[in-house]
Amino acid sequence: MMGITYDTGALVAAEANRVDIWALHRDALRHEIRPVVPAAVLAQAWRGGPQHQLSRLLRGCKIEPMTEQLAREAGAACGAARTSDVVDATVVISALSRGDLVVTSDPGDLAHLADALNKPLRLHSV
């Protein structure tokens, strides 16, 4: 099994206690894969309340910090794709750097960013 990167839609699905994301997450952990959550994704999904299901999911994830290099690459990706969604761009750059599968509720926008970079990106919709 390859690495996995979660976008905001995956975190929202976990908080909604959707069976599909939990099955995928349990399978990843069973195969000793710790999904990556870019810090920008966490910021977009976190609303300050208890968010018990999201907190439970995050315990099995690695939070990837927003480094200067990642920020620059995400900004360049936004420019190439003519979009302003830096969170989506961060997900794409992050996943491409490792060859991860991206778990998303927004495959169209992520595919558009990857296409603008002429890079193949594996997507799984939730």
Regions from the PLM with identified roles:
Residues 21, 42, 51-54, 71, ...:
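A general structural signal for well-ordered alpha-helical segments in protein cores
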Residues 37, 65, 86, 104-105:
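Short beta-strand scaffold positions
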Residues 96-126:
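Acidic, PIN/NYN-like endoribonuclease modules and their adjacent C-terminal/linker elements
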